[in-house]
C-alpha cells in the first residue's frame, strides 16, 4: 500500500494513496449514504477547514465544428444538434469577459476550443496571449482544446497556464460506447504530456451516459491512481442535448452525483472536486449535499460551452445558504 501523509491545519493526517483497487472504489460508491458522507466529511474538514469553494468561469472561445464523435456533445459535426458555429473570439474580447468574471467573484477562467487537437499558427498564438492576459488579471487560467504536442504543452507552461483540462469522460471499459474517433490511451498520453510540461491536470468525467456503477468505479480508480492526483476533478452530469445519440437518456438521480463527489473526495483528498455540467437538474438541496460531501469548486456563470448553467445571482444565493466561503466573501 502506497501512503503519503498530508498534515492538515489541525495537525491531523490525511493519507494520500495511489494504489486503490477496483473493489475498494466500488465498495465506497456502494456504502450506505450516511456512512459515505461521514467518511467524506472527515477528509474534507481536514483538507479544507474553512469550507472554501472556488468559482471558475468557462468561456467557449471556438464553438462547433469539432471532428470528434462524442455521443453527448452538441459541438460534434457527427451530431445534428442545433447550435451555431462561429469564429474564434478575439483576444481582447476574451480578456474583457475574463475581467467581467473576476469582477463577479470568479478567480479561475477556463477557455474552451471545439478542436480535436491544438493547431499551430495564429489560433495557438492567440491562445497563448489569452493565457498571459488572464494570468495578468491575477486569475488562474485553464484551457481545454483537445490533444496537443510536447512543444505546445511547453509553450502553454511558459505562458503561465495553470491547468489543462482533458476529461476521460467515462471508464476504459465503457469508452468505445461514447466516442470512437480518439482512444482512451490517447487521452492518457495527452495528460502525460501536460504533466511533463509542468502544468497541472484538470480531468474528470460524466455520469448519466448509460454507464454502470462498475464503470463509475473504474473511472474513479483511473483518476485516483494518477500520481500526483489531478489538481481538479470535474464531475459532470449528462445534459441530454437534442440531436445527440444520448438525447433520450433520463436525468440522473441527484444522489448519484452526491455519491460520486463523496467518493472522489475520499480517494483524492487534495484535489479540487468541481461540480460542473448538469447542476441545474440537481436542485439546491442536492448541490448543498455535494458541498457537504466534498465539492469545493463550481463552474460559475450563465453558460457552460453550449449548455445552460445556473444564473450568477442564483449561485450567490445557493452558496450563501450553504454557508461556504467564496472569493467575494473572503475579500469583503
UniProtKB/Swiss-Prot annotation:
Pathway: Cofactor biosynthesis; biotin biosynthesis; biotin from 7,8-diaminononanoate: step 2/2. The keyword ATP-binding does not apply. InterPro entries: Aldolase_TIM (IPR013785), BATS_dom (IPR010722), Biotin_synth/BioAB (IPR002684), Biotin_synthase (IPR024177), Elp3/MiaA/NifB-like_rSAM (IPR006638), rSAM (IPR007197). Its EC number is 2.8.1.6. Binds 1 [4Fe-4S] cluster. The cluster is coordinated with 3 cysteines and an exchangeable S-adenosyl-L-methionine. Binds 1 [2Fe-2S] cluster. The cluster is coordinated with 3 cysteines and 1 arginine. One of its GO terms (biological process) is biotin biosynthetic process. Belongs to the radical SAM superfamily. Biotin synthase family. HAMAP family: BioB. Homodimer. This is Biotin synthase. It comes from Prochlorococcus marinus (strain MIT 9211). The gene is bioB.
